[in-house]
């Protein structure tokens, strides 16, 4: 077949990719509006699809379970689900758009060593993926998610690895969202590592800029994230006082 490998990969993954894009759009809508009941209905719909016995339906179901658990605080996925997800990602020799999307939307719950192996491999191959225009922003988003995840887990050396990768992305001026989230994440790093109070002000400025751009639902997500970070630190400080 006279077709470049990237186009061939897209042809093979077309159906899976389009179905996942539709699913992720619904997941994002539920997350941004905090629609837990809507996400539960989405999970039921995906579990019904699992009867088709296609591997990707099972992987899609795991993704919804992970995001629903994060949204609701109730338990939906287990170690077997994570093992199945990990086995799938390691088992695919050439990642296409589908695998990139699955990884970047589940990397925060993978075991840290597994996540780092997969993320480093993705970074190592990022020049290949960046040749496909649609994947450039996907790679950037994956790196941003990985950077923030490492900071949250206080894996600061690993976080610096992703910061270095992100600095090589050279976000163009129109990529405002990526620039703002990178700036937010850099200040999150400063706050988590050094307790820098000025970093809190800078993170709030980033959220303010997102609001100014009219992305109010997105701003609420980051407001919730910052509130959670500050709340956890406050609880730890209170526990320290008790002892």
Give the positions of each predicted feature.
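Short C-terminal boundary/hinge segments that cap the last helix of small helical domains
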Residues: 2-19
